[in-house]
A protein has these predicted regions:
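Cleavable N-terminal signal peptides
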Residues: 7-8, 18, 29
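Short helix-capping/linker turns of helical repeat alpha-solenoids
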Residues: 33-36, 49-51, 56, 69-72, ...
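Hydrophobic face of amphipathic alpha-helices that form TPR/SEL1-like repeat modules
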Residues: 42-49, 78-85, 90, 115-122, ...
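Sec-dependent N-terminal signal peptides
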Residues: 4-14
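Alpha-solenoid helical repeat scaffolds
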Residues: 29-30, 58, 65, 95, ...
Length: 197
């Protein structure tokens, strides 16, 4: 008898969770269809991750685009990611990715600033420009984004777009490492091992 009660409790707990999730998606869809940019981006993320709906990258791009065109920085960044990797679009398009990263980066969206810096560093979708890469990495790093802090540290280590400066290298690696960013922790350990720190 206890097994039956336990099974019923588990069933209803699961069913109520599914019901709540379905209700949230329906509400999100209604808001997105009414033109709310944040809801459009959130719905795009739901389709991208397959949370509450079946994963559908084409639908994700559709909703990211609607929100991005309303100047939603997170959606612009998400759309840039889709074009960069070719998710939900016909093919990878670095130029289109840079366009959307730039729009989000100009709104101080740190992840987009870092991604834009990466594109400039490696000449993906834009002409290679190390000074421009450093500019965008710095903006994101100053906002506390550990990946950008690590990338900026690498630029200072090798003199990419800035004058070589081991003190700055260690400073930025340390900031990223203190946020548990594994790559920066590795680089910092290597620097101390070589006596650079």
């Amino acid at each position: 008898m206890k097994k039956i009660y336990l099974i019923m409790i588990l069933f209803f707990a699961t069913a109520s969770g599914v019901f709540a999730q379905t209700t949230n998606i329906v509400t999100l869809m209604l808001k997105a269809k009414s033109g709310e940019a944040e809801a459009q981006n959130a719905l795009g993320e739901a389709y991208y991750d397959g949370k509450g709906v079946t994963e559908n990258l084409t639908e994700a791009v559709k909703w990211f685009t609607k929100a991005a065109e309303q100047e939603n920085a997170k959606a612009q960044y998400n759309l840039g990611i889709c074009y960069y990797y070719g998710y939900g679009v016909q093919y990878k398009d670095y130029g289109e990715a840079v366009k959307w990263y730039t729009k989000a980066a100009e709104q101080e969206y740190a992840e987009a600033q870092n991604s834009l810096g990466y594109c400039y560093e490696f000449g993906e979708g834009v002409d290679k420009n190390l000074k421009e890469a450093v500019k965008w990495y710095t903006k994101a790093a100053e906002q506390g984004l550990p990946m950008a802090q690590c990338n900026l540290g690498v630029c200072y280590k090798y003199g990419n777009g800035v004058e070589k400066n081991l003190e700055e290298t260690i400073k930025w690696y340390t900031k990223a490492a203190n946020q548990e960013y594994a790559q920066a922790q590795y680089y910092l350990g290597k620097a101390y091992d070589k006596g650079d720190g």
